[in-house]
C-alpha cells in the first residue's frame, strides 16, 4: 500500500489508470530486479542457503560466519570476488572467509609477547637517552607515547610510576613528565638502601627464611600467627601502610598536585622492592618473601584471594620494569618444594659507607640523632639544604581525624555535675545582697510554712516593695485611691526603710510564729501617714540611711549602692531557742548592766556591724532630706535583728551613745517606719486607721525595738486631729496581718500599768519644745525610741549640729509583743502610748475578726 501511495503521489497523471495492488506490486518487483545488478552492496547474496546446510567446525568459525552475514563490508567483499566462486565448495568458501579475517586480527591485535610490560618498557626507554642533556627540553607527553607505541595509556603509566620511584622522571602536569635519565639513579639507590636499613628489611628477610626452613608447610601455613606477630612487631611501624614515598633533595616535583600523588601504592611498593635487593646479603629476593614483607601477613589474611593476586601482579609489573632497566634479572630458586620465581640484583653496587651521594651521609647522622616518630617521613631522610618536600602519611591523617573526633566529643559532652554544683553554690553565695531582695528571701522562707492566703499576699507585697519610685503629691480628693498608687512611694535619696511598704493592707511579717523564748518587736503598718511637724516651725528631717550607718559612709548618695539586706542563708538569721531564752534571761538583769548585755546580744546575734559614733554623727549631718515617717508593721525577734543584715537591721546602740554619754539606750535595729518627703505631707491621708496611744505588752529585751509613736518630733499641730482607734480595729489589723494569733488581745487605749508611766506624746512634745526649742528626729526609721531608767532620749536631726538629750526623766516603758507559743509570765504590765495628737480620717478596714491574747512581762 505504501508503494501504491508513493506511485500515486509521484505520478498524479496516471490516477485514472490505477490497477489492482497485486499487479502494482508485481510491477514494482520487476523494476527492482532490473536495478539490482547496479546496486551491488545492497543485494542479498544467494549463498546463505548453501552455507546453512553445513555446520561450522568451531564456535569461532560460527561467530565469524554470523559476523560476515551481518557486516556489509564482508558481504561487499564476497560480492566482488564473485558469486560463482562461492558455489565451488564449502571448504574453499570457508577458507576464503577465514584467511582474510585472521590476517586483519593479527594486524589489529599484537601477540602476548608484544603486549608484555617488559617489552613495552624497552621500547619506551629506547626513545630517550640514558643521560639526557638538562639544557634541552626533555618533556614527555604520555598521550603521544601511547599513540606511537600503539598501547593503552594506562600501560605507560605503569612504566612511568616505576621510573618515578627511581627519580628517572618527574611529573610536570597531567600526562606530562620530564625525563632525567640515570643522572640521579646512584644517589637514589644509596638513599633507598639507607632507608631499608632503618626499616630492618634484612632482619625480616632472614627471619622469614629461617621460619621457612624450620616449617614444612605451604605458603600460608609456613608463616602462622607467630610469624605474623614478629613481622608485625618489626615491620608494623615501617611496613607498607606506614611508609612514605622517598624523594631526593635535588629532585622536587614542580607540579602543584605532586604531593597528592606521593603515596601511590605502585611507587611506594617499587621503592620498597628495590630496598629488599639492596639490603639483602645474597642480593636475591623471591616474590614470596617480597610479598610477605611488602604486602604483610595481616593483609594476606584480611584480603581475599583476588586482591592478593592483584598485589602479586603489581610486584610482577615492577619486576618487569626493573628488568628492562637492567637492575634485576629473573632467576629460579630451587628448594625442596620446587622452584620459586626470584630476582637477582644486577644493578650498580651501593656500599653503605659511600652510597654514591654526598647528601646521604648527613642524613644518616640526623636520623641517628633524632629517634622520633617522624623518622619514617621522607623529609627526615635528607639534608635540609634542599627545599623540603612535606608529605603527610595516611596514618597522620587518621591521627588528626581521631583527635578531631575526640575534641568534638569532649565539646559536645554535657558539663560535669561537679561544675554545675560549684556554679550553683557560687550563684547561691551572697557576695553582695541585692538591696531588699534578700530580706524578701527571709520572708519567703518563713512564709512557706504558712498556707493561708493573707500570708501569701504578704509575700507578694514584699516582692513588690523592692522597687523605689518617686511618690507624686496626691490630691486630697483621691485619698481613697491612695492604696492603688502606693507602689510609687519612694524614699528620698539616702533613705532606706526596712521594707518600703506599698501601703497595702498586707504587711510583710518576719517570723510570724516562733515556738519559744525570744523577745519580739511588733511594728504596726497602718495605711496612713503620721505627720511629723516639729515645733517652732522647723521642718522635719530624716536620719541617714542604715546603709550609711552600716558602712560608715559620709556621703548619703552612696547609700543606694551600699544598701544590702539580710540573706536567708546567713548562719545567724535563725537562732535556736536556747539563744532566745538567753536573751530573755539577760533582759531581766539590772538596768545598768542591761546596756552592755544588750550590746553583746546584738553582736552575738548576727554579723551586723556596729557603726562608730563619729561616723554616725557625720552621717546624721549629711542627710538633710525632710520626710514623713509611716509606721509599718513587722514582728521580728530582737535577737535576730543584728543578724538580719548590716543595712536595714543595724542596731542603734552606738547612735544612742552619741546622743547621751551618760544614758546608753539601744534603739530598734529594725526599721519601723517608712520615710516620705515632707513635700508630700499635706497630700497623704490614709483611710484605715492611724497610730494613737497604743499599749503593747512587751518584754524588757524588746523595748528598744518597738516603734514608739510619742517621739518629741511629733507635733500636735496637724490641722486634722486624729482619733484614738478602738481596740477592735487594732486587733483586726494585727490578726489580718498575721502579727498576732486569734487568742491574743491588744489594748489600743491608754491606761496605767503597774510600775509604768504611759508616755504622753503631747506633754513630751511640749516639754522638749520648751526645753530645747528644736525638733529632734530619730536617726533610724524607727518612729520613736524608748527610754531607759526614766531618761527620755530623742534622736537628733540633720539640722542639729550636736545631738541633744532631753533633761526630763521618765520611767522606761518597754513594749513587747508575745507571739503564740512563746513563754508567757503574768507580771506587771508596761505600756507604750502611740501619739494620738495627729488626727486623720478613718477608713473601712475589711479584715477578719480574730481573738487576741496579750501577755506581759515584768519590766524590771
From Swiss-Prot:
Alphabetized Gene3D superfamilies for the sequence: Winged helix-like DNA-binding domain superfamily/Winged helix DNA-binding domain (1.10.10.10)
Keyword Phosphoprotein found: yes
Biased composition (Low complexity): 411-426
One Pfam family cited in the UniProt record for this chain: E2F_TDP
Superkingdom as given in the UniProt entry: Eukaryota
MF (Gene Ontology): cis-regulatory region sequence-specific DNA binding; DNA binding; DNA-binding transcription factor activity; DNA-binding transcription factor activity, RNA polymerase II-specific; DNA-binding transcription repressor activity; DNA-binding transcription repressor activity, RNA polymerase II-specific; identical protein binding; RNA polymerase II cis-regulatory region sequence-specific DNA binding
Main location: nucleus
Positions of modified residues (Phosphoserine): 71, 412, 416
Transmembrane regions: none
Keyword DNA-binding: yes
Residue ranges of DNA binding: 112-181, 261-347
InterPro entries hit by this protein: E2F, E2F_WHTH_DNA-bd_dom, WH-like_DNA-bd_sf, WH_DNA-bd_sf
GO cellular component: nucleus; RNA polymerase II transcription regulator complex
Residue ranges with Polar residues bias: 542-554
GO biological process terms on file: cell cycle comprising mitosis without cytokinesis; chorionic trophoblast cell differentiation; fibroblast proliferation; hepatocyte differentiation; negative regulation of cytokinesis; negative regulation of transcription by RNA polymerase II; placenta development; positive regulation of DNA endoreduplication
Regions of compositional bias (Basic and acidic residues) in chain numbering: 74-84, 92-114, 555-565, 586-596
Localisation per UniProt entry: Nucleus
SUPFAM superfamilies: Winged helix' DNA-binding domain (SSF46785)
Keywords of this entry: Activator, Cell cycle, DNA-binding, Nucleus, Phosphoprotein, Repressor, Transcription, Transcription regulation
Region (Disordered): 1-114, 407-433, 533-616
Domain notes: In contrast to classical members of the E2F transcription factor, atypical members contain 2 DNA-binding domains and regulate transcription in a DP-independent manner. Both DNA-binding domains are required for DNA-binding and are proposed to form an intramolecular structure that is similar to the winged helix structure of the E2F-DP heterodimer.
Family per record: Belongs to the E2F/DP family.
Subunit structure: Homodimer and heterodimer: mainly forms homodimers and, to a lesser extent, heterodimers with E2F8. Dimerization is important for DNA-binding. Interacts with HIF1A.
Role played: Atypical E2F transcription factor that participates in various processes such as angiogenesis and polyploidization of specialized cells. Mainly acts as a transcription repressor that binds DNA independently of DP proteins and specifically recognizes the E2 recognition site 5'-TTTC[CG]CGC-3'. Directly represses transcription of classical E2F transcription factors such as E2F1: component of a feedback loop in S phase by repressing the expression of E2F1, thereby preventing p53/TP53-dependent apoptosis.
Protein's UniProt name: Transcription factor E2F8
Organism: Rattus norvegicus (Rat)
Gene encoding the protein: E2f8
Amino acid at each position: 500500500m505504501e508503494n501504491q501511495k508513493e506511485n500515486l503521489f509521484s505520478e498524479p497523471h496516471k490516477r485514472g489508470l490505477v490497477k489492482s495492488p497485486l499487479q502494482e506490486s508485481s510491477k514494482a518487483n520487476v523494476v527492482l530486479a532490473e536495478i539490482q545488478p547496479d546496486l551491488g552492496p545492497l543485494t542479498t547474496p544467494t549463498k546463505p542457503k548453501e552455507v546453512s546446510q553445513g555446520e561450522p567446525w568451531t564456535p569461532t568459525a560460527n561467530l565469524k560466519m554470523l559476523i560476515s552475514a551481518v557486516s556489509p563490508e564482508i558481504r561487499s567483499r564476497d560480492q566482488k570476488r564473485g558469486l560463482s566462486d562461492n558455489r565451488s565448495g564449502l571448504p574453499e568458501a570457508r577458507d576464503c572467509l577465514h584467511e582474510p579475517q585472521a590476517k586483519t586480527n593479527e594486524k589489529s591485535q599484537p601477540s602476548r609477547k608484544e603486549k608484555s610490560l617488559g617489552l613495552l618498557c624497552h621500547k619506551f626507554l629506547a626513545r630517550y637517552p640514558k643521560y639526557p642533556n638538562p639544557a634541552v627540553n626533555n618533556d614527555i607527553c604520555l598521550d603521544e607515547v601511547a599513540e606511537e607505541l600503539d598501547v593503552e595509556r594506562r600501560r605507560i603509566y605503569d612504566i612511568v610510576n616505576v621510573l618515578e620511584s627511581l627519580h628517572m622522571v618527574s611529573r610536570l602536569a597531567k600526562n606530562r613528565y620530564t625525563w632525567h635519565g640515570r643522572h640521579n639513579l646512584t644517589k637514589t639507590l644509596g638513599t633507598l638502601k639507607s632507608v631499608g636499613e632503618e626499616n630492618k628489611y634484612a632482619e625480616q628477610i632472614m627471619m622469614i627464611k629461617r621460619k621457612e626452613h624450620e616449617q614444612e608447610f605451604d605458603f600460608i601455613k609456613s608463616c602462622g600467627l607467630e610469624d605474623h606477630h614478629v613481622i608485625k612487631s618489626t615491620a608494623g611501624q615501617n611496613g607498607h601502610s606506614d611508609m612514605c614515598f622517598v624523594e631526593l633533595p635535588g629532585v622536587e616535583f614542580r607540579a602543584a598536585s605532586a604531593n597528592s600523588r606521593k603515596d601511590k601504592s605502585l611507587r611506594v611498593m617499587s621503592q620498597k622492592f628495590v630496598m629488599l635487593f639492596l639490603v639483602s646479603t645474597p642480593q636475591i629476593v623471591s616474590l614470596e618473601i617480597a610479598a610477605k614483607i611488602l604486602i604483610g601477613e595481616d593483609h594476606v589474611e584480611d584480603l581475599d584471594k583476588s586482591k592478593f593476586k592483584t598485589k602479586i601482579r603489581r610486584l610482577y609489573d615492577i619486576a618487569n620494569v626493573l628488568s628492562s632497566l637492567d637492575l634485576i634479572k629473573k632467576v629460579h630458586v630451587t628448594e625442596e618444594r620446587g622452584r620459586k620465581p626470584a630476582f637477582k640484583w644486577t644493578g650498580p653496587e651501593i656500599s653503605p659507607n659511600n652510597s654514591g651521594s654526598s647528601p646521604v651521609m648527613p642524613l644518616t647522622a640526623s636520623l641517628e640523632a633524632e629517634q622520633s616518630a617522624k623518622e619514617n617521613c621522607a623529609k627526615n631522610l635528607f639534608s635540609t639544604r634542599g627545599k623540603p618536600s612535606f608529605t603527610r602519611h595516611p596514618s597522620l591523617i587518621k591521627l588528626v581525624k581521631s583527635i578531631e573526633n575526640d575534641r568534638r566529643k569532649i565539646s559536645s559532652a554535657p558539663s560535669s555535675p561537679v561544675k554545675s554544683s560549684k556554679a550553683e553554690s557560687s550563684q547561691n553565695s551572697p557576695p553582695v545582697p541585692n538591696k531588699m531582695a534578700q530580706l524578701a528571701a527571709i520572708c519567703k522562707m518563713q512564709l512557706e510554712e504558712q498556707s493561708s492566703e493573707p500570708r501569701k499576699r504578704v509575700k507578694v507585697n514584699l516582692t513588690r516593695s523592692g522597687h523605689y519610685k518617686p511618690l507624686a503629691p496626691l490630691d486630697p480628693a483621691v485619698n481613697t485611691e491612695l492604696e492603688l498608687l502606693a507602689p510609687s512611694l519612694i524614699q528620698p535619696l539616702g533613705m532606706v526603710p526596712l521594707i518600703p511598704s506599698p501601703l497595702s493592707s498586707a504587711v510583710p511579717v518576719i517570723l510570724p510564729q516562733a515556738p519559744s523564748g525570744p523577745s519580739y518587736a511588733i511594728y504596726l503598718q497602718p495605711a496612713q501617714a503620721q505627720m511629723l511637724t516639729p515645733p517652732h516651725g522647723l521642718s522635719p528631717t530624716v536620719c541617714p540611711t542604715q546603709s550609711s550607718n552600716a558602712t560608715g559612709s559620709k556621703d548619703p548618695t552612696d547609700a543606694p549602692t551600699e544598701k544590702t539586706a539580710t540573706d536567708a542563708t546567713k548562719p545567724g538569721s535563725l537562732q535556736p531557742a536556747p539563744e532566745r531564752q538567753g536573751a530573755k534571761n539577760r533582759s531581766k538583769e539590772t538596768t545598768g548592766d542591761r546596756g552592755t548585755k544588750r550590746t553583746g546580744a546584738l553582736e552575738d546575734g548576727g554579723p551586723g556591724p556596729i557603726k562608730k559614733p563619729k561616723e554616725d554623727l557625720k552621717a546624721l549631718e549629711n542627710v538633710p532630706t525632710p520626710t514623713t515617717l509611716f509606721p509599718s508593721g513587722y514582728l521580728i525577734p530582737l535577737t535576730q535583728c543584728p543578724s538580719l543584715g548590716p543595712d536595714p537591721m543595724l542596731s542603734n546602740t552606738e547612735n544612742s551613745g552619741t546622743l547621751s554619754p551618760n544614758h546608753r539606750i539601744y534603739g530598734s535595729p529594725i526599721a519601723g517606719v517608712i520615710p516620705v518627703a515632707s513635700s508630700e505631707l499635706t497630700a497623704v491621708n490614709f483611710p484605715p486607721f492611724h497610730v494613737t496611744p497604743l499599749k503593747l505588752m512587751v518584754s524588757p529585751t524588746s523595748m528598744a525595738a518597738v516603734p514608739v509613736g510619742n517621739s518629741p518630733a511629733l507635733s500636735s499641730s496637724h490641722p486634722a486631729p486624729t482619733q484614738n482607734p478602738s481596740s477592735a480595729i487594732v486587733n483586726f489589723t494585727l490578726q489580718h496581718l498575721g502579727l498576732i494569733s486569734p487568742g491574743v488581745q491588744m489594748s489600743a487605749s491608754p491606761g496605767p500599768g503597774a510600775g509604768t508611766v504611759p508616755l504622753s506624746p503631747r506633754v513630751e512634745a511640749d516639754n522638749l519644745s520648751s526645753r530645747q526649742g528644736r525638733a529632734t528626729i530619730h536617726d533610724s526609721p524607727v518612729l520613736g525610741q524608748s527610754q531607759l531608767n526614766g531618761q527620755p532620749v530623742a534622736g537628733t536631726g540633720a539640722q542639729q549640729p550636736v545631738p541633744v538629750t532631753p533633761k526630763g526623766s521618765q520611767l522606761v516603758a518597754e513594749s513587747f509583743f508575745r507571739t503564740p507559743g512563746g513563754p508567757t509570765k503574768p507580771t506587771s504590765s508596761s505600756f507604750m502610748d502611740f501619739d494620738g495628737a495627729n488626727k486623720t480620717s478613718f477608713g473601712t478596714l475589711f479584715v477578719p475578726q480574730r481573738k487576741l491574747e496579750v501577755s506581759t512581762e515584768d519590766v524590771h
